[in-house]
Regions:
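Pyridoxal 5′-phosphate
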Residues: 1-266
Length: 266
């Protein structure tokens, strides 16, 4: 996911962004969907706009639509928050962006492993996710993009395989997807990712989502019986993530205590 967003920020920025242009993200983004755009903002002198949320950890859709101007060039928003569990109305958000002729990047790192996602139904221009989030190897992931957009973007890195012809005067680049795959690919990682996707597909994403919802509801209700418990993120549409604090106990201390009891938390 991280490398995919960096690739898109770099290539899209090189092709389409100029000083004064705008990129929209949300307040609930992972650092991987903030820092690449901040780096781009420094290089290209563009503006980063942020969609706010309400007390239930839901994005304010009215405020989102107000952020668009004729300088808005791309929207990049997380599908499911890795901290709050909020499932954002991505399909609706994409439609709004397209009404303004603006492409949309979906960070699906937290949704692909936990629910059925259809890029064509969403009409996403770009979608990214990580292999290790879906029980595959680390260091490998997926960048999906509509062919019309990928053809417009310059290569992110140079090297073998992403070229057709090289001379000291000029280089011509390979067709998709090889244009964005410089050097020797991670054959082992991609094979492992394919097996992981086969594994969750065989179980059924609907079954996974239903079971995780049941566990999340049970855990939430049990946690609420603990004195001083504070749960963050109570959106109407919520994934299987629960963030909490207990009284004034520092989260590091709580994590250490739970670890000693054999309970894993993040």
């Amino acid at each position: 996911t991280t490398e995919s967003i960096n690739l898109l920020a770099s290539s899209f920025g090189e092709a389409f962004l100029h000083p004064g242009d705008e990129v929209i993200v949300s307040v609930m983004e992972h650092h991987s969907n903030i820092v690449p755009w901040q780096l781009l903002a420094e290089r290209k002198r563009i503006n980063l706009k942020v969609i706010p949320m309400n007390d239930r950890s839901e994005l304010l859709m009215d405020e989102y639509e107000k952020l668009f101007t004729d300088r808005t060039k791309i929207v990049s928003v997380v599908h499911v928050s890795n901290v709050l569990g909020t499932v954002n109305p991505i399909k609706e958000m994409i439609k709004i962006a397209h009404n303004h002729d603006v492409p949309f990047l979906v960070d699906a790192a937290q949704s692909i492993p936990h629910m059925a996602v259809d890029v064509k139904d969403l009409d996403a221009d770009f979608l990214v996710f990580s292999g290790h989030k879906v029980y595959g190897p680390t260091g490998v992931g997926v960048l999906y993009g509509k062919e019309e957009w990928l053809n417009k973007l310059p290569p992110y890195q140079g090297g073998g395989e992403m070229i057709k012809h090289v001379s000291f005067e000029r280089t011509t680049f390979n067709e998709l997807p090889f244009k964005f795959e410089a050097g020797t690919p991670d054959y082992i990682g991609t094979t492992g990712l394919a097996k992981a996707l086969d594994y969750v597909s065989a179980i059924g994403m609907d079954k996974i989502a239903a079971y995780e919802h049941e566990l999340t509801e049970y855990a939430t209700q049990r946690l609420k019986t603990i004195p001083g418990m504070r749960i963050f993120g109570e959106a109407a549409e919520k994934g299987s993530v629960i963030s909490f604090l207990v009284g004034d106990i520092h989260h590091f201390d709580m994590g250490t205590l739970l670890d000693r009891l054999g309970i894993a938390v993040r």
